[in-house]
Amino acid sequence: MNKTWIKEHWLEILLCVGIVIQIGALAVFNLTRLPYESNYDSSCAYAQIVEMWRQKRILLKDWAYQTTLGIDSPVLLGALFYGITKNAFTAFGLANIVTVIVYACLFYDILKQADVKKNMRLLAVLFLLTPYSTGQLGYMPMLFTSAGSYAYKLLVPLLLIDILVRMHKGQEIKKYWYLILFATFFVFDTAVSSGEYILLCAVLPLIGYEILHVLIGNDIKQIFNKRLGFLILESAIYVVGIKVGRRTGIIESVGSQMMLTNCLLYTSPSPRD
């Protein structure tokens, strides 16, 4: 590495250093601070991985589930790490670190496939890993620390977007078959655990985008394309997952279902005289 190369790529180097520092900070937090910032939700997740390893089951016996089955979060990976470390906090911290790295790589790949400049890709990843908010329902605890309750849910639309971008570019499926495999797994996993939430908020909007893309192209014949076919197939798998989740008899995932209400029911009361 010579001085000329460093001079030409100084911003790229700086952004890479920033990302490494950010991942390192998240790793240190996950390995040292989880016992001190535990809350009701995260405590349930920590206890769940202990029971999953003890019972050697994904769906636990004699367990009071909350709003979801929790398997669309780092608990599956956490249970495996618990079998090695025998420490729930360390195990979940390691699972969260893996999640952070997966997000950084996946987000970078989406932007790369979309032909975004390299420096902008690195900057976007740096922003992705920035701890915008903390607290029980903050950005970081929901994705990269604590119980990571939305970590795997959000992987569903990100994986689907990565695949769709590749399809738009005309790449052969053999180059990204593994992404389709992971996307299908997380689609089914999330459906079983959390009900129709991600289907309504992530998968169906992507179908809407693809339909709009065809309409803008003014060629209705293009409506029968592999991108829409892929999304419809994933939606069907999602619906099957919902049915499977409900047939477990453990939980209805009511807390994760979308409840649509009439906004007129919440109008302000008339001012007093």
Give the location of each predicted region:
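Start-transfer (signal-anchor) and selected internal transmembrane alpha helices
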Residues: 1-26, 230
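Juxtamembrane segments of multi-pass membrane glycosylation machinery
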Residues: 57, 76-99, 103, 115
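Membrane-interface micro-motifs in multi-pass membrane enzymes
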Residues: 71, 119-168
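Perimembrane helix-loop-helix junctions
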Residues: 200-233
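Conserved small/polar residues in nucleotide/adenosyl-binding loops
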Residues: 266-273
